[in-house]
Amino acid sequence: MKIISPVLSNLVFSRSIKVLLCLLWIGYSQGTTHVLRFGGIFEYVESGPMGAEELAFRFAVNTINRNRTLLPNTTLTYDTQKINLYDSFEASKKACDQLSLGVAAIFGPSHSSSANAVQSICNALGVPHIQTRWKHQVSDNKDSFYVSLYPDFSSLSRAILDLVQFFKWKTVTVVYDDSTGLIRLQELIKAPSRYNLRLKIRQLPADTKDAKPLLKEMKRGKEFHVIFDCSHEMAAGILKQALAMGMMTEYYHYIFTTLDLFALDVEPYRYSGVNMTGFRILNTENTQVSSIIEKWSMERLQAPPKPDSGLLDGFMTTDAALMYDAVHVVSVAVQQFPQMTVSSLQCNRHKPWRFGTRFMSLIKEAHWEGLTGRITFNKTNGLRTDFDLDVISLKEEGLEKIGTWDPSSGLNMTESQKGKPANITDSLSNRSLIVTTILEEPYVLFKKSDKPLYGNDRFEGYCIDLLRELSTILGFTYEIRLVEDGKYGAQDDVNGQWNGMVRELIDHKADLAVAPLAITYVREKVIDFSKPFMTLGISILYRKPNGTNPGVFSFLNPLSPDIWMYILLAYLGVSCVLFVIARFSPYEWYNPHPCNPDSDVVENNFTLLNSFWFGVGALMQQGSELMPKALSTRIVGGIWWFFTLIIISSYTANLAAFLTVERMESPIDSADDLAKQTKIEYGAVEDGATMTFFKKSKISTYDKMWAFMSSRRQSVLVKSNEEGIQRVLTSDYAFLMESTTIEFVTQRNCNLTQIGGLIDSKGYGVGTPMGSPYRDKITIAILQLQEEGKLHMMKEKWWRGNGCPEEESKEASALGVQNIGGIFIVLAAGLVLSVFVAVGEFLYKSKKNAQLEKRSFCSAMVEELRMSLKCQRRLKHKPQAPVIVKTEEVINMHTFNDRRLPGKETMA
């Protein structure tokens, strides 16, 4: 029997005990949960309730512990510490206290000074530091134990810039709360150098919440596009003050950089018409997110806001949602690192946590779909890189989503794709508008009534009917106010200030200007206009001239001076041509003594004086004893008779009108006539569109007219159309005004008339302040009225008067070349034909004489030409050789006494 050594026995027993204890520890470990502590440092206000971030921190830890899906074998605990605002020393002390307890990560604090102090400690000891608010990164630190769930400031700045570009703003005012706002909005601040954008930067008062002085200055400067970079609590106060100052109207558009715009109580502003736009990172369209937010609201973990704070009760703020997501993201990293344990760390020893680097890497690699959407981090600097923003805007139903923005795709506006039918009355329905106008017949005038009238019932006219139709279509109500200074609106050359209705629109004292307000270039630069509801132009109003009886020489009027001159020239020309052709044609020569066939003398009746007498006789329809014998001269005579027939008939027909009509002679017929004289004064309404036209015109005639008017400004420029019309009636004055008003006036006053045509072309439109959302609605309604024919019917209603008796033509039109020029062409053609016939007769007779006289054709032609060129009525014929004349030829000569004697054709 072998004996076992006591020493060996003790060794075996000891090892067995250790194995048993190890197995028991493993079994215990598998049957129990691992406990992990998170640290939270939060700022607080003395005597104030617990902050939303701390509540969300506790809510997230409790939710994870209740729902074992994420960390089934780990129980989270937390240690929370409170510090005063901006107390970095206290923040460092609290962080060291938590690290000595042993924490896996520290959440918070929020403000930069405290957060930087805590971050430096976490970096030194290798403990992750989780941030949920924006903090400026001084420099990239690859080894930084820091992540932030707040969207990157450069991305948010680009999102705001995209909104500004989408709204096509040209001027923007940036209002920031503290200096960090300029860093957050640096992309927008750099925009003027790259885009056509004017930027004005203002800062909210630091020591008070009273923003009224700043808002008053912005209102005076007409700054309608404003970006507010402030907290949602400050935004709520600003909106209340803006409402009290009348800055919550449709002309203002505010963009808020806070992601908590949805937490504001916007009920007082829903129907104000103000444009309010912002961003939201909470993914409220996700059912799981909505369920968590609903639990948050039901448990009412967050302390209710103060009664007049302007914030909604029970809403989960963005800071709270980001803290909730931050706890879950860190928990995802814990899930992937089950062997991690925490240890007590001392700030004065600078010994880092051995699991810190690995744990920090897991946090930066973590992905989570949280309340604020996808959560991923830049592994280098720990900033959140991938996120989606909802673009929200204030509507009558409240804040609604109108688009999205993300860093990769940019802005995507989806407001028009909501399936709602387009309705032009949406933005005007049930709104009450201030309408400025001016008394101007027939556009706006006081209604005549035996009973006292009040409000809008005091007025009637074309513009009042137009306003009533627009109100019916668009569904708005209105209050009519007469412009205070009684002017349409013009710009002062010295200080550049506007007056009249234009000024009231610029100052937003009125929403619409419904009046005969002309659309001009200079006005269009400061206010907006609808499409014109009436087109017109500038013309001249002048009194009708007195009638005059026909003058002593009015018998010359039926034909224009040009025609009289052409007739005289035609008479002289035809007479000369007849004389030449008669001399040239052999058949116009005859024997004055037919009984003496041997006579060598021949005669030609068409001497120069006789030719003129022949033309006068035909022209006076009396005839003469002279009768052409040759074909060529008869052609001249016939054409001249035809010419005189047409001329005399036309003259006779037109003479009656000139002798019976009283001519209405006006000293001016056009603007050129006005510009060329100074006897008749002329002017327009002071500070009206007509005056501005002449003032700005570069055309020499109109520039000359403006020089005349400006030199006599006090005497020729009038205050109103009524004053100008009265001056036309009582003095030698021409009034420049719109053609439609002239048409109305001349229908009712038969002593007035329009002189000339239109000097320019323009239109009347409904004026609105610059950028008004009403302009397009008004334009659509005006086009609808135009298509329905209502604009024409309204004009017929107000322009139709008793009418003046129809006037006969002021004067019969003198016949000009365009009326009877053809007869001159016929006359010229006849003269040309007669010349050719005369040449033919000359050649034929020369050839015949050459044969009879037995000589050459050329010598015979020269002899005939020599005789024709002698301006004598009777010539003696000198034959070159004797010729025996037979009896038959003598008899033949006596028979035709208009032919030359045989053998005598050639004259000496």
Curated annotation (Swiss-Prot):
Record's function text: Ionotropic glutamate receptor that functions as a cation-permeable ligand-gated ion channel, gated by L-glutamate and the glutamatergic agonist kainic acid. L-glutamate acts as an excitatory neurotransmitter at many synapses in the central nervous system. Binding of the excitatory neurotransmitter L-glutamate induces a conformation change, leading to the opening of the cation channel, and thereby converts the chemical signal to an electrical impulse. The receptor then desensitizes rapidly and enters a transient inactive state, characterized by the presence of bound agonist. Independent of its ionotropic glutamate receptor activity, acts as a thermoreceptor conferring sensitivity to cold temperatures. Functions in dorsal root ganglion neurons.
Annotated L-glutamate binding sites: P516, A518, R523, A689, T690, E738
Assigned GO CC terms: dendrite cytoplasm; glutamatergic synapse; hippocampal mossy fiber to CA3 synapse; ionotropic glutamate receptor complex; kainate selective glutamate receptor complex; membrane; mossy fiber rosette; neuronal cell body
UniProt family annotation: Belongs to the glutamate-gated ion channel (TC 1.A.10.1) family. GRIK2 subfamily.
Reactions performed catalytically: Ca(2+)(in) = Ca(2+)(out); Na(+)(in) = Na(+)(out)
Glycosylation sites: N67, N73, N275, N378, N412, N423, N430, N546, N751
Extra remark: The postsynaptic actions of Glu are mediated by a variety of receptors that are named according to their selective agonists. This receptor binds domoate > kainate > quisqualate > 6-cyano-7-nitroquinoxaline-2,3-dione > L-glutamate = 6,7-dinitroquinoxaline-2,3-dione > dihydrokainate.
TM annotation in the entry: 562-582, 639-659, 820-840
Subunit structure: Homotetramer and heterotetramer with GRIK5. Tetramers may be formed by the dimerization of dimers. Assembles into a kainate-gated homomeric channel that does not bind AMPA. Can form functional heteromeric receptors with GRIK3. Forms a heteromeric complex with GRIK4 and GRIK5. Interacts with DLG4. Interacts (via C-terminus) with KLHL17 (via kelch repeats); the interaction targets GRIK2 for degradation via ubiquitin-proteasome pathway. Interacts with NETO2.
Cross-linked residues, Glycyl lysine isopeptide (Lys-Gly) (interchain with G-Cter in SUMO1): K886
Residues of the signal peptide: 1-31
GO biological-process terms attached to the record: behavioral fear response; chemical synaptic transmission; detection of cold stimulus involved in thermoception; excitatory postsynaptic potential; inhibitory postsynaptic potential; intracellular calcium ion homeostasis; intracellular protein transport; modulation of excitatory postsynaptic potential
Pfam family, one: Lig_chan
Topological domains, Extracellular: 32-561, 660-819
Location within or outside the cell: Cell membrane; Postsynaptic cell membrane
MF-aspect GO terms: extracellularly glutamate-gated ion channel activity; glutamate-gated calcium ion channel activity; glutamate-gated receptor activity; identical protein binding; kainate selective glutamate receptor activity; ligand-gated monoatomic ion channel activity involved in regulation of presynaptic membrane potential; PDZ domain binding; scaffold protein binding
Residue intervals on the Cytoplasmic side: 583-638, 841-908
Documented activity regulation: Cold receptor activity activated by temperatures between 10-19 degrees Celsius.
Consequence when changing P151L: Abolishes cold receptor activity, no effect on ionotropic glutamate receptor activity
Modified-residue entries (Phosphoserine), positions: S846, S868
Lineage summary: Eukaryota, Metazoa, Chordata, Craniata, Vertebrata
Organism: Mus musculus
Protein name stated in the entry: Glutamate receptor ionotropic, kainate 2
Post-translational modification: Sumoylation mediates kainate receptor-mediated endocytosis and regulates synaptic transmission. Sumoylation is enhanced by PIAS3 and desumoylated by SENP1.
Record keywords, A-Z: Cell membrane, Disulfide bond, Glycoprotein, Ion channel, Ion transport, Isopeptide bond, Ligand-gated ion channel, Membrane, Phosphoprotein, Postsynaptic cell membrane, Receptor, Signal, Synapse, Transmembrane, Transmembrane helix, Transport, Ubl conjugation
Disulfide bonds: C96-C347, C750-C804
